[in-house]
Amino acid sequence: MDSVAYIIVLAMALSVLFFAIAFREPPRIEK
């Protein structure tokens, strides 16, 4: 159970960093 919670925490941390960078700079990626 501890390993699962640890992975979830890492995923949340990565998502927070991703959104922080995405909102910090304007999206330059064009689809």
UniProtKB/Swiss-Prot annotation:
NCBIfam families linked: PRK11875.1
Membrane protein topology class: Single-pass membrane protein
InterPro entries tied to this protein: PSII_PsbT (IPR001743), PSII_PsbT_sf (IPR037268)
Gene Ontology BP terms: photosynthesis
Keyword Transmembrane helix part of the UniProt annotation: yes
Protein's name in the database: Photosystem II reaction center protein T
Keyword terms, alphabetized: Membrane, Photosynthesis, Photosystem II, Thylakoid, Transmembrane, Transmembrane helix
GO CC terms, sorted: photosystem II reaction center; plasma membrane-derived thylakoid membrane
Stretches that traverse the bilayer: 3-23
Function: Found at the monomer-monomer interface of the photosystem II (PS II) dimer, plays a role in assembly and dimerization of PSII. PSII is a light-driven water plastoquinone oxidoreductase, using light energy to abstract electrons from H(2)O, generating a proton gradient subsequently used for ATP formation.
Chief location of this protein within or outside the cell: membrane
Gene that encodes it: psbT
Family label: Belongs to the PsbT family.
